[in-house]
């Protein structure tokens, strides 16, 4: 019997449905917490992909009207996860991206879609499902943010509440006139509640009303308390600083294991790095790059957005050509960046290759085949790509922000002398500083003994969920003890 029961509320979860790192965290953390005596059940919307994969499902909350049509709650399992599923076809039975119309705009009913998720989470928190009464409700990102409000304003004795910020840039702000329609009482629309500059703030509600706030790296926890990175919420976060903690993410080291990865060409580990070049050759072929084992091959797996700094990399294409460096990019996002990237690939055949979209298998192949992974983010709450790069023997080249600063040891002179470097950092995140760091990478590439030492250091780094899970478990235990 587990000592603490947690209900996680998420809008996506790997391997059922994924648009970003939130899904990876939601999918991997429950198993890691089980080893700490924490039992996690996860509430997720009944998207088509979820409904197709859930097994042994039984109805635990009967159908009732919810924003225009009946909805019910199922409990079942998929991929080893204990799941509650909000089965509401009128809200979730839509193809493609779970948040966006095909033209990239938000679904206009998103406030109701995710309020429904939060109201269901609140009901489960109060024991609406037979045999399940969680000690803690753990809400992830803005889509789950109103759960704290529904629990707070209900008036009954409630479970503890924890809000996790995966990216403060996405806040879920909606018109104030929706307050009643969303089932919130008038008193909720206050500075201490859901009100946020005249709107209803889903994430703001979570940050104001939750017992604890976590975010996904210590550096990001400090950054978001500043006007530069606080996205308008820095004042609130400063007032709640004693309730805020940064806990680094891990990765699922069974899914991300180069020694047994079925998605890559040639499995390898730190003892068999001589096998790794076969993956590089396959990657060059996949992206239409020249079959040159001696060329430094940079990989990118990213959203194509201003935040991720892909424009900084595109500004250095002439430099990469002078250095004889190749580039393979997997990503999707802002149309202008997509256009520039495709133009670069067309103008530089054999040197630049691009696949637009997201493909899990190609992401694994880039990690296994690229010599280095470039992550030039202007801000980065944690980042998982650099953790995968460490595990797969690709040198992370990262901006010194957020979780990138916390997880990569820059190979400066002191680190090289001490034998502890694991990658390259640059600051500030500008095109010129990235260019200088790419030149530094090219110089290190020309010294195979040093390069190999950095790669081996990275592969020996523990990037699993073991330590983060222990920190979450302590947070949950402390909260239960205080209540």
Swiss-Prot record:
One of its GO terms (biological process) is glycogen biosynthetic process. Pathway: Glycan biosynthesis; glycogen biosynthesis. Its EC number is 2.4.1.21. GO terms for molecular function: alpha-1,4-glucan glucosyltransferase (ADP-glucose donor) activity; alpha-1,4-glucan glucosyltransferase (UDP-glucose donor) activity. ADP-alpha-D-glucose binds at residue 18. GO terms for cellular component: cytosol. This is Glycogen synthase.
């Amino acid at each position: 019997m587990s000592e603490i029961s947690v209900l996680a509320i998420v809008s996506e979860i790997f391997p059922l449905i994924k648009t970003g790192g939130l899904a990876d965290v939601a999918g991997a953390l429950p198993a890691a917490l089980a080893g700490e005596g924490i039992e996690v059940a996860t509430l997720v919307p009944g998207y088509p992909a979820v409904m197709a994969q859930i097994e042994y499902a039984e109805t635990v909350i009967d159908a009732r009207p919810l924003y225009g049509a009946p909805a019910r709650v199922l409990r079942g399992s998929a991929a080893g996860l204990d799941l509650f599923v909000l089965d509401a076809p009128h809200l979730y039975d839509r193809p493609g991206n779970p948040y966006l119309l095909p033209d990239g705009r938000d679904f206009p009913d998103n406030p109701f879609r995710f309020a429904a998720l939060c109201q269901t989470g609140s009901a489960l928190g109060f024991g609406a499902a037979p045999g399940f009464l969680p000690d803690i409700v753990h809400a992830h990102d803005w889509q789950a943010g109103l759960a704290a409000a529904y629990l707070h304003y209900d008036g009954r004795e409630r479970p503890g509440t924890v809000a996790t910020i995966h990216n403060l840039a996405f806040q879920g702000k909606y018109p104030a006139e929706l307050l009643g329609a969303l089932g919130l009482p008038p008193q909720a629309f206050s500075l201490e509640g859901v009100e946020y500059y005249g709107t209803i703030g889903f994430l703001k509600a979570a940050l104001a009303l939750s017992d604890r706030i976590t975010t996904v790296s210590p550096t990001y926890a400090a950054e978001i308390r500043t006007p530069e990175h606080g996205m308008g919420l820095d004042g609130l976060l400063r007032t709640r600083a004693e309730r805020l903690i940064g806990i680094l993410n891990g990765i699922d080291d069974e899914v991300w294991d180069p020694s047994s990865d079925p998605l890559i060409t040639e499995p390898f580990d730190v003892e068999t790095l001589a096998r790794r070049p076969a993956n590089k050759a396959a990657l060059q072929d996949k992206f239409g790059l020249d079959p040159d084992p001696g060329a430094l091959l940079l990989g990118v797996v990213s959203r194509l957005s201003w935040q991720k700094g892909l424009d900084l990399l595109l500004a250095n294409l002439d430099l990469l050509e002078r250095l004889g460096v190749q580039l393979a990019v997997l990503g999707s996002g802002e149309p202008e960046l997509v256009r520039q990237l495709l133009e670069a690939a067309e103008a530089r055949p054999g040197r630049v290759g691009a696949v637009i979209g997201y493909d899990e298998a190609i992401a694994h192949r880039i990690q296994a085949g690229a010599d280095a992974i470039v992550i030039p983010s202007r801000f980065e709450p944690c980042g998982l790509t650099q953790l995968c790069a460490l595990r797969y023997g690709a040198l992370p080249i990262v901006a010194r922000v957020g979780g990138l600063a916390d997880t990569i040891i820059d190979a400066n002179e002191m680190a090289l002398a001490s034998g502890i470097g694991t990658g390259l950092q640059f600051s500030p995140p500008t095109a010129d500083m990235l260019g200088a760091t790419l030149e530094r990478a090219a110089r290190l590439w020309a010294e195979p003994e040093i390069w190999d030492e950095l790669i081996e250091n990275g592969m020996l780094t523990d990037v699993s969920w073991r330590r983060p899970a222990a920190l979450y478990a302590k947070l949950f235990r402390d909260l239960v003890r205080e209540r």
